[in-house]
Amino acid sequence: MKICLVGVSCVGKTTMGKRLAERLGYAFFDLDAEIEDTFGTSIERLKSELLTEYSFRQKAALVLKRLVRQQEKPHCVVALPPSGLMDHYARVLKQGACVTIALYDRPENILARITFYDKDSHPIHKALSAAEKAYYLREITADMTYFGPWHRKSSYPKIRHVCGDFAQIIRFLRRHDVLWPMAP
């Protein structure tokens, strides 16, 4: 089984995904990290080489296809980018019969987890001013509005990020007969 987590940036896809995978005994993949490993460059630099976001997703979907089709680790959890249910990604996920789960949280909680990176994907520590916090709250809300229609197309579109309670996802999947009894 392939479980794919989607949501806006910093909603907790990687953190929850790692914990969920560990609990289930599944492999974990962060699609952004896999894309960077595959192409040998940061996502920002890769995007700058391509004409549009669409062409980036077209190229990046090849990495997702490899993850979904790989047989060495048939059970895995994959953290997708916010655009993870759009065009090329959506086709790959549909062909791979993946279970997709959209994670949500309040913009204020997401802002508390916000992380910044340089062009080479190295984390940058940044203390935000009140004006910057207000700006990023607006940006997070705008992302939630923009990506919301795609996230609502996920298999299970409204699982909230509750203080890292990945057990909520397990209970939800069991309740919908997605996890068989053998899963912890």
For each predicted feature, which ranges?
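Walker A/P-loop
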Residues: 14
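Conserved substrate/cofactor phosphate-moiety recognition/catalytic segment
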Residues: 18, 22-62
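Glycine-rich phosphate-binding loop used to anchor ATP phosphates in small-molecule kinases
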Residues: 55-99, 103
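A glycine- and Lys/Arg-enriched "phosphate-lid" helix/loop adjacent to the NTP-binding pocket
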Residues: 97-147
